[in-house]
Amino acid sequence: MAGIYLHIPFCNSKCAYCGFYSLPSLKLKERFLEALKTEIVMRKDYLHGLIVNTIYFGGGTPSLLTIEEIGELLHLINNTYPIGNDPEITLEANPDTLSLEYLEGLHQLGVNRLSIGIQSFFDNDLQYLSRKHDSHHAQQCLDWAKLAGFDNISIDLIYGLPTSNAAQWNQNLDIFFAYNLPHLSAYALTLEPNAILTKQIELGKVQPVNEDDALRDYEILCRRAAENGYLHYEISNFCKRGMHSKHNASYWFGTPYAGFGPSAHSYNGNSRQWNVSSVEKYCEAMSAASRSPLKVGARRAGDSKEEPCFESPLPPLEGGNTKCGIEKEILSPEQHYDEYIMLRLRTHWGIDLKYMKREMGERFSTYCEKQAQPLIAQGRLSQTREFLYLTDQQMLFADGVAEELFW
């Protein structure tokens, strides 16, 4: 099993809270798509012939691509990689980019899962977040998606907003439950260092974030999701039984995946790769690679991260460095252990000590159990038989618990 992720870095505009790599312009779209197609073909051996069961268009705003452009990418992937029966094909979308005609086109292409960035069903929240859609369009696009034939729909909501309160957050959840959607991703508003909202708060232009409000909303979310039959299967994700995101779950289970596009990451079981976080440099790299074999250099744990350590067919870029656009790190056994802890602790499946002993060795499972005992005694971690996991309340402190379990 394997997955494919395509990073589409374009947006209509930059949302105030966003810390992801994206461009609020489409002027490089045509050049980018050619580069993306080059990478898809160039790296066809990366997954070693594994069957691809999930394809995920993330961003940015993938729904800024036309139906024809998405169709060309899917056709290329189908002709380049072995695709499983009934693969999960997800496309992230923003309400302001959607129409009934567009959604019908996606469905006809074989896209069978939507992840829609609603964020809130209230205009005051949407304005605070600098979203382009309004509350009417937020609900209209869900109606359209159902009319177009989609039944696997996820939406994003943000809680802990200073423009909201407990009553309004409950109303947001009321609307979600009324649509009977199978999946919800809900995130506390966080202040990313490079986000517009962070600067606005620092300058006193908008209301600051209150952590107590976020905690209140999280508790409401967990309680109401359980009451309505949703499984809290990952810190920020809730689903009806069997309707979890197969693609995202593959990350948490260590399934190999290839990431294409600027800033995209890949993992093949032994190493991680990541692409340069610049559309222009990415396009330059793929253009050069199409004319000359691309060599990806390996960096081991402990190596300096200051300079790229791979060969490149590119001429020198800024500062005299050369970059082929892809960098690679070979993971040590200790790094594999830490990644397993970090990823699995986020989920309701938790850490499987038997799996750890079998796949990583007894020294790792013994160490993990030893580190876990004081955390269990303190009520910060739970254990059932060979599984270590976090309850809803314990998930609030997942990062701190993971750090104490790390090698």
How does the language model describe each region?
Residues 295-298, 306, 318-320:
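Glycine-biased, low-complexity coil/linker segments
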Residues 376-386:
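A short, conserved structural fragment
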Residues 9-20:
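Local cysteine-cluster metal-coordination motifs and their immediate loop/turn environment
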Residues 395-407:
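Short, amphipathic alpha-helical interaction segments positioned at domain boundaries
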Residues 1-3, 22-45, 50-291, 321-362:
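C-terminal scaffold of the Radical SAM
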Residues 362-374:
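Short amphipathic alpha-helical interaction segments
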Residues 387-391:
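Minor-groove-contacting beta-hairpin "wing" of winged helix-turn-helix DNA-binding domains
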